[in-house]
Structure formats: C-alpha cells, structure tokens
Regions:
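Membrane-helix interface motif
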Residues: 36-50, 108-130, 194-218, 280-298, ...
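Transmembrane alpha-helical segments of multi-pass membrane proteins
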Residues: 18-31, 88-108, 177-194, 263-280, ...
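N-terminal, membrane-interfacial amphipathic/helix-forming hydrophobic leader that caps
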Residues: 28, 86-96, 118-130
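N-terminal signal-anchor module of multipass membrane proteins
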Residues: 2-75, 103, 107-108, 154
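Alpha-helical transmembrane segments of polytopic membrane proteins
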Residues: 24-28, 53-70, 95, 109-110, ...
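C-terminal transmembrane-bundle signature of multipass membrane proteins
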Residues: 28, 32, 36-43, 232-253, ...
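Cytoplasmic membrane-interface regions of multi-pass membrane proteins
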Residues: 2-18, 71-94, 156-183, 205-209, ...
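Internal, hydrophobic cores of structured domains that mediate oligomerization or house catalytic pockets
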Residues: 110, 114, 118-137, 152-220, ...
C-alpha cells in the first residue's frame, strides 16, 4: 500500500505537546470558548441570530455533523491536496475546512433540499411552498421544512459512518479519490433516502390536515406499537444507532466483532450488530423513563406523552456520546494496558458515568448558560442541539486541526500501519480461555440490569433533578 493511499486520519499519529494534563486543559479551553462564542452568535435564544427555534438550529448543527463526516471519513479531505493537508498550519487548515463545511451545509439545506426537492418533488422541504397552503404560518412552514431536512441528516449520520466502520468501505475500498468518495457517498445517500421514505416521510404526511393518505401511510404503520403517530419513534432508535457506531469505532475498538475472521461475515455481523445493540439501548432508555416517571399516556402533552418519551430516548443517547468522544480524542482511549475486553469494560463504565454527569448538569444549569427552557419536556427544550454543536466543534478540532493546540501530529508509514494492524489482529484472536470471562460477563450484565431496574424508582423518589 502506498502512503498516499492511506486515509489521512489513519496515517497520522497525534501526540501530546506537553506532559501532564495541560494538553487536555488547553484544548478544553480552546474548544469550549469557541462553543460559547458560536452558541451565542448562532443558537442562543438571547443571542444574535437565534437559530434555536428549535428546528432551524437543530437542522444546521445536524447537517454540519454529516458534512464533517463526509469530508473526513468518506472523501478523505478531497479535493484538497494531501501535501496541503499534511503541511498547513492547524489554524489555517481548521478555518478553511470549517468554512468549506459550512458552505456545503448551506448548499445541501437551502440548495438541494429546499430549492430542488422543495420546488420539484416534496412541498414540505420548502418553507415558501408550505406558506402557500391554507393555515400554515411562516413560523410553522419554516419549522416543518427544517424538521424534514433534519430528519434525513439524522439517518445519514448513522448510515454514512456505519458504511466505513462496519462494511469497511466495501466494495469501493480500493478505488482512488474521488471515485471512492462519490461511490460511497451516493450509495449511503440512496440508502438513507430509502430509509427516510419508510420512517420519516409518513410523519410529514400527518402534519397537514387532512392527512395525506394518497402519498403517505397514514396513520403510520408503527402507531399501534409505539403508541404515537410521531416519527420520534424512529428518531429514538436511529439516534441510538448513531451513538453506537461511534462507540464501536472508538471506545469499543469494534470488539467483539473483530474476533470474526471471515471478512464478509464480520462486516455483516457488525453492521446489523450495531442495529441490534441500538435497539436494545433504545428500549432500555424507554423502560428507564417508565421506571422514573410512570407509564406513558397517549394524548398527554408533556413528559408522559409517548412521542416525547421516544424523542427523549434519542436525547439520552446523545448525552453518552459526548464523554465517549472526549475519552477517545482527548483521553487517548484510556486505558490501553489491559486486555481488549477489560479496556472496553472500563471505558464503557467511564462513559456511562460521564453521560449521567452531563445529563444531570445539562438539566440543572443549561437554562442559565445556554438560554434553553428549564425542565425536561418543554417544546423549546432540545438538548441534542448543544450536544451536537459541541461534538461538531470537537470533530473540527480533532479531524481538521489535528488536536491543536494540545497535540502535535506525526506521520506513520504504510509499514507501521500494517504492523499495527497485525498486532491488533493478534490481540483480537478468539481463545477458549475467554469462555469463563464471557460467562462471568454475561452474569454480571444481567445482575447489573436488575440492579438498575431496582435502583431507578428509589432514586426518582429521593432525588429531584429539576425543581
């Protein structure tokens, strides 16, 4: 393999610029300052542009996320020259690539979805077309169009990285850019569009009265199971898929699926394993809400409403993605000195603790710091917006800026990468000696599940997070 065929994110090695905690502190000060300034300018309801409506702001931050994934993971920074990517100063590179990503985001939202699809295919993508319908105000037209566009990005932000992480870019892995990038992009875009039609399109068909029986399945097919006609049911499990993809890529190191040595079987198992884990996580988060707040009540307007409960499943999942990416990027995916299963277990525990802490801090103080509404289920309360906004900034810092200022970049040769891949394969070999540990792990997992189920009602009765 020639060095120029290695994806840039794989050929680089980021090392701390200073000893001790100073690199982490420097990057946190840098990224959180950018978050605070940009949040005030673009999102904060008390700020300047006030995109937090909430769907307009959510649409932008969600599409920014998928554009970053496309640029770094799928196109490998094409059309920028590899020499410029390697040699440009991190600040210059971060600024240029960020501006390009914002331009692409605006092109996709306002160019393709709003003006092309909205004017020639689906009315609900265009605020201008929606305002021509009787009874729709400018505000709701804008919100509905933003919601429709955002829902596609939700699906794409799961499918696009999953194609790389689980399917390893097959069948175009050996193509050069831009053929490889456009092939994967078109493949994942079309698959995302099919999933959109089967999940989100029916939701858009019920937002205007009378329901659009001829063009959508109304009421949607999931109504009896999910106890709601809202596509928040799909937002729940798809958001969990998005989170689990990055768990698998980062803190889990694709374990235990990396133990499967047959490539085709491994890719198939990993892709659908991500979905299976996500569904389990989705229904567990739903059950947690029932343990804390009681049964969902169809027709309720706030925290007992099934549609909000499903939305909150996705919101809960995203709280755990923040510490997972922090640990992967700035924590060096600590620990690394034990066996892979032990490393994965410790990281998962740390991410669980971190996710709970972020969840509690957000609902306790976000209305002061971010200008959001106090409480859990207010229509203006969308925690996924600030969480994904922060994640976007971290991705820019780590992918575009090579971890500057706390980290510096070194380049690895193809021989070093192959040697590391062989070492990873050796660590990922199945052994019968793992069977006792596997049995203990399953037993411990079952015990932990019942312990959480028993503890949640007690914590709910004795602690109040939001007064």
């Amino acid at each position: 393999m020639a060095d120029h065929d290695i994806p840039y994110l794989e050929e680089r090695k980021l090392t701390k610029r200073w000893q001790g905690p100073w690199p982490i502190l420097a990057n946190m000060a840098f990224t959180l300052s950018i978050f605070a300034v940009t949040w005030w300018i673009f999102q904060d309801p008390r700020g300047i542009m006030r995109f937090y409506t909430p769907y307009v702001g959510y649409n932008y931050c969600r599409w920014w996320l998928i554009i970053l994934i496309w640029m770094a993971y799928i196109f490998d920074f094409w059309p920028f020259k590899r020499n410029w990517i390697r040699n440009a100063h991190p600040l210059q590179k971060g600024l240029v690539l960020s501006l390009v990503s914002v331009g692409l985001m605006m092109l996709m939202i306002h160019g393709f979805f709003e003006n092309v699809l909205g004017n020639f295919a689906f009315t609900y993508f265009s605020p201008r077309q929606l305002q021509k319908l009787p009874g729709l105000t400018e505000f709701y037209s804008t919100e509905y169009a933003a919601q429709a566009c955002m829902m596609f990005a939700v699906i794409a932000s799961w499918i696009s990285p999953a194609w790389i992480v689980a399917l390893e870019g097959r069948p175009w892995q050996n193509e050069a850019q831009p053929v490889k990038g456009f092939s994967i992009w078109l493949g994942t875009f079309c698959l995302s569009l099919v999933i959109y039609f089967m999940t989100m399109h029916n939701h858009m068909g019920i937002l205007y009265y009378p329901w659009q029986y001829f063009t959508a399945i109304t009421p949607p097919y999931w109504e009896s199971f999910a106890q709601t006609v809202s596509a928040n049911f799909h937002v729940a499990w798809i958001m969990c898929c998005t989170v689990v993809v990055w768990f698998m890529e980062g803190i889990w190191e694709r374990y235990p699926f990396c133990l499967i040595k047959r490539p085709g079987l491994r890719r198939f198992a990993l892709f659908f394993g991500i979905i299976a884990i996500s569904l389990a996580l989705c229904f567990f988060f739903w059950y947690m809400q029932e343990l804390v707040w009681g049964d969902a009540i169809r027709g309720h307007r706030r925290d007992a409403a099934p549609d909000w409960r499903w939305l909150h499943v996705g919101e809960t999942a995203i709280f755990f993605l923040v510490p997972a990416l922090f640990l992967q990027f700035y924590g060096g995916n600590w620990p690394n000195k034990f066996s892979t299963p032990v490393n994965v277990l410790i990281r998962t525990v740390l991410v669980a603790i971190g996710g709970i802490a972020v969840y509690c801090l957000y609902y306790k103080y976000a209305h002061f710091a971010l200008g959001t509404q106090k409480g859990f289920s207010h229509p203006q309360q969308f925690p996924m917006i600030p969480m994904i906004w922060l994640i976007d900034i971290w991705l820019i810092n780590w992918w575009f800026m090579d971890g500057w200022p706390g980290w510096k970049r070194e380049l690895r040769t193809s021989e070093e990468i192959v040697a590391e891949e062989h070492a990873f394969a050796d660590r990922s070999a199945w052994s019968p000696a793992m069977i006792p540990g596997l049995a203990v792990g399953i037993l411990a997992g079952v015990m932990l599940y019942f312990a959480i189920v028993a503890a949640l009602p007690w914590f709910s009765a004795h602690f109040t997070l939001v007064q």
